[in-house]
């Protein structure tokens, strides 16, 4: 691997942020902080008018209060436990800042629980700026028609950074895992973000102190925003486990919600 490619890979993985526990210790699922933050930002933009979200971080509320997950976690992932969201925000002066903060807190808590399945127990907000009141924009003229008589299509809106697409799996088991995961409702695609460029399915052996060696599989994927991320992850774990004759342990890492 060249120095430039290595630098690019490191920057990409740093951009993912923390790997946050999704659900509880028995769910065997994680989500990147980048993906979770994008969902919270969309929720704030849609559900908290007059408020603009700034810097946002998600971390364990109490690192001492964390149970062991039921499956091996992805490298450097946080253990399951209650989470704290810390964010800066700006708001207009049409209402007291504590009122704006309360509205934003409710929106963030709802999105974390209902759209993702994060166990958020604390949300710390800090007001950093005042915004000018929003002025309704005047009606815009209809778009010009093309020669075909159809209105010109607008450019697609810029969204959150998308993870690298996954390469084709190698081997029969990799193919079986891929097919099982993609068949689950709510899975948009497999991604390759954490374990090297394009690797979405990771198969390895784990041995405990008393148990015999057992295979462990990690699947990286993107979920549909209309499905709760933790519910999709649970179904993927079950589908992948049942797709292989040795019924390995399975962990799921959600790298995007779109």
What are these model-predicted stretches?
Residues 40, 44, 96-116, 226-248:
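Short, non-transmembrane amphipathic alpha-helical segments
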Residues 114-188:
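Surface-exposed beta-loop interaction hotspot
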Residues 175-178, 183-190, 203-220, 224, ...:
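C-terminal interaction module
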Residues 1-24, 153:
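N-terminal, Lys/Arg- and Ser/Thr-rich interaction peptides
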Residues 17-73, 166-206:
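N-proximal, solvent-exposed amphipathic alpha-helical segments enriched in charged/polar residues
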Residues 82-137:
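Extended, hydrophobic interaction surfaces within ordered domains
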Residues 49-90, 124, 128-130, 189-222, ...:
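Short edge beta-strands and adjacent turn/loop segments
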